[in-house]
Amino acid sequence: MTRYAFGDTDLARERLGLVAETFREPTARLLADVPPGVRRYVLDLGCGPGYTTALLLDAFGPGYVTGIDSSSAMLAEARMRVPAAFFVVADVTTPLKLPAHVVFSRMLLGHLPEPERALVRWANAVLPGGALVCEEPVRYRSTRKVFERYEATVTEVVAAQGATLWAGPALDSDPPRCHRAIDRIAEHAVAAGRAAAMFWRNATTWRGAPDLIAELQDLERANPDETVVWEIRQTCWIKR
């Protein structure tokens, strides 16, 4: 089972809460733009503590939304957060056993080896007329040197797991029997202090980064009047 590079500690859960709040708007817009159709059975891959699962319930209404994650601790929190959904411990790098009208992932491929193969496996679980929906970062733009240092460090951490941090290009290839309905770059501005808050919580899972953590914490407290701009690739395929 693929190990998540950033762990499932209390700080990791705090970071995921910040990520959920920070990127809620672009994700909600993407889900609203998914072409209409039968959307009764929905899978949320790498659901963590259930933030994206709640968005899927909001977007597709009553039905059967199932969150899948490798961490039982994360899923315990997800069950409390989204009692209307179902949750299953499973490895998203293996074939999915639940067919669905919608298969969704956000910022997950960057943690997986061979992301293109993962897309093919996920598409195999999509029912005809259903949608495979993915969001992956392409890059972020900032003039802050500390953010450049963070990016270099996290790129190495993810690469050590056999994965690629900026997984947006993995969405270039079309899974078999799928055609693109959406393919766009969403730009999303985030306050520099909020970006620093997410980043230092990540950095605590690595050894040997105390100076980087301290500088990011100082930046969170200072909360300067500037932004970091994420470029997020949003793609939706419809299964033939």
Each predicted region: which residue ranges?
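Class I SAM-dependent methyltransferase SAM/SAH-binding core
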Residues: 41-43, 49-95
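Residues lining the SAM
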Residues: 105-110, 135
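Conserved alpha-helix/loop element of class I SAM-dependent methyltransferases that forms part
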Residues: 21-41, 55
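A short glycine-rich, Lys/Arg-flanked "PGG" loop and its adjoining helix->strand segment in the class I
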Residues: 116-128
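A short acidic, Gly/Pro-enriched loop at the edge of an enzyme's catalytic core
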Residues: 94-103
